[in-house]
């Protein structure tokens, strides 16, 4: 008996593993074009945050190239190997999530019971949904009884924990991929055609329930998409630069609400702002829509190109009846509502899915193995070059995590001392820039604080940068500049009370009675998005100042 007949995966043998040429596909060509466009964007808009983003892009490109070469040599063998790895990986995550739910292990987020190895239940749920869709598809495609047992047990474990993540976007992605899978099975296809009205009704009810479950969050995401589209249009074909999404978003949101306030009455007429949008807005840390995020940072052409790559890979995988098609569908839908491509696990998944989608057995242009290997070495050199700088950034992040203790204890002189040395490697970290800038403010170094905070506000949508810069101006007796900065902070996110209170205190310091009384009356009637003990404290402080005016 030959060795190749003993060592077998379902439907494959060692005969399938043989050197092959790599046939280039349209997916490969579009991927190269997209990489070149992102590289041009990186060169046109250089910054520290762009360095970080391009490192991620280089990682995905390298993973895609390596996977593409490996898969082209033996698609079936590599496919089953990766499905087996998926079983191990997702079962490990699911079991860890169950242990977190039952309290035997701690989650990675103090607000949520289960996160797996992730730091948030959203990505955790999305990861499980992607794995579940692949396992379910492989269960229906293969006839192996052994695989049915393995996949069936894995599916059961994942289904048990998935609802605990409360990831609506993950469940929506899973529903989309399972709907496509159902249409490939004749029995289910006939059922859907016969009872389409019932399927439609159930879909509408489920969609409405998902919306109402977290209505405020859903409204916020829709408003974010609206502002993102405006920002993408405003930045033209070249985009704003890699990693600049949040800074551009904050600017665009400010301009949007400023245009409404300008047609109102008085300095800040809150009634002129659309109330639903006022309560829906926030200062996001990520795009929560990967496609619009690419459009804002690299331009609409890059966004369309990326969508085309994903869709083409998806179609090719569906034609091949590959279970990875359903993983890609789930991931693609999940990316509309979340930020998977910021997370290494999803970056690797995306690279592998696209590599499978690009692999073809048919006719096509043949690339020599030497050219393919040279491409990998070139990308490897680029990755290594970026990785060196990334190591310095990672070291600085670790040092800063120790220094943050002093920030929490209000030992600002220690923060400033360490911040000076860490600044060159942490210009991409807006949290560091804010805390370092505020510490400089507390230490009376107002000009230096301004320069640090200005750098931070360019990569963040958080209005707190402008509040602290307003405090810098106030400390230097530049009242009009302080007023403009406080106003900007409020208009950026007009559901926060703090900037209005700073404005009121500014007018009180100036002795401007009329403007103080006007802004204090607005504070009395102001509805904040989140009412806390702190908002009540702020109202109490303004009421105490106001009492001095009414007692006169």
Where are each of the predicted segments found?
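Alpha-helical transmembrane segments of multi-pass inner-membrane proteins
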Residues: 2-6, 28, 32-43, 51-69, ...
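Flexible juxtamembrane loops connecting transmembrane helices in multi-pass membrane enzymes
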Residues: 113-114, 177-178, 202-236, 240-243, ...
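Hydrophobic/aromatic packing residues within the alpha-helices of TPR/SEL1-like helical repeat arrays
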Residues: 412, 419-420, 453, 486, ...
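Conserved structural position within tetratricopeptide repeats
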Residues: 424, 454-458, 488-491, 525
């Amino acid at each position: 008996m030959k060795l190749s007949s003993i060592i077998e995966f379902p439907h494959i043998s060692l005969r399938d593993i043989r050197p092959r040429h790599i046939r280039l596909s349209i997916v490969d060509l579009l991927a190269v074009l997209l990489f070149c466009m992102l590289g041009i964007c990186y060169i046109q808009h250089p910054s520290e945050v762009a360095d970080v983003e391009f490192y991620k892009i280089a990682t995905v490109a390298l993973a895609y190239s390596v996977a593409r070469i490996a898969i082209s040599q033996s698609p079936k063998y590599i496919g089953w190997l990766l499905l087996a790895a998926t079983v191990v990986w997702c079962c490990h995550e699911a079991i860890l999530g169950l242990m977190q739910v039952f309290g035997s292990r701690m989650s990675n987020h103090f607000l949520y019971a289960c996160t797996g190895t992730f730091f948030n239940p959203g990505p955790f749920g999305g990861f499980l949904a992607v794995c579940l869709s692949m396992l379910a598809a492989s269960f229906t495609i293969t006839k192996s009884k052994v695989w049915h047992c393995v996949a069936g047990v894995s599916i059961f474990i994942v289904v048990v924990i998935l609802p605990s993540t409360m990831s609506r976007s993950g469940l929506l992605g899973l529903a989309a991929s399972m709907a496509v899978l159902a249409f490939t099975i004749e029995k289910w296809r006939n059922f859907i055609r016969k009872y389409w009205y019932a399927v439609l009704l159930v879909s509408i009810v489920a969609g409405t329930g998902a919306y109402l479950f977290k209505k405020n969050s859903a409204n916020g995401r829709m408003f974010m998409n609206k502002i993102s589209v405006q920002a993408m249009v405003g930045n033209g074909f070249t985009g704003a630069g890699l990693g600049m999404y949040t800074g551009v978003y904050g600017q665009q949101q400010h301009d949007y609400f400023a245009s409404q306030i300008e047609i109102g009455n008085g300095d800040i007429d809150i009634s002129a702002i659309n109330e639903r949008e006022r309560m829906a807005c926030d200062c996001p840390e990520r795009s929560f829509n990967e496609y619009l995020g690419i459009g804002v940072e690299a331009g609409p052409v890059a966004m369309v190109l990326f969508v085309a790559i994903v869709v083409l890979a998806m179609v090719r995988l569906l034609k091949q009846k590959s279970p990875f098609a359903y993983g890609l569908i789930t991931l693609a839908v999940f990316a509309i509502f979340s930020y998977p491509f910021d997370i290494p696990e999803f970056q690797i998944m995306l690279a592998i899915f696209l590599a499978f989608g690009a692999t073809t057995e048919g006719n096509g242009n043949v690339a020599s193995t030497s050219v393919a290997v040279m491409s990998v070495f070139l990308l490897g050199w680029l990755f290594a070059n970026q990785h060196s700088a990334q190591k310095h950034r990672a070291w600085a992040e670790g040092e800063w995590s120790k220094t943050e203790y002093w920030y929490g204890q209000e030992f600002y002189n220690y923060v400033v001392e360490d911040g000076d040395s860490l600044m060159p490697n942490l210009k991409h970290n807006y949290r560091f820039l804010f805390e370092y800038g505020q510490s400089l403010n507390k230490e009376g170094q107002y000009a230096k604080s301004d320069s640090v905070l200005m750098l931070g506000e360019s990569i963040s949508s958080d209005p707190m940068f402008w509040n602290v810069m307003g405090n810098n101006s106030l400390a230097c007796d530049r009242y009009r500049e302080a007023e403009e900065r406080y106003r900007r902070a409020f208009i950026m996110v007009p559901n926060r009370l703090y900037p209005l209170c700073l404005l009121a205190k500014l007018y009180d310091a100036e002795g401007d009675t009329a403007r103080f009384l006007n802004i204090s009356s607005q504070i009395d009637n102001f509805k904040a998005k989140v009412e806390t003990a702190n908002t009540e404290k702020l109202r109490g402080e303004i009421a105490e100042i106001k009492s001095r005016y009414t007692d006169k």
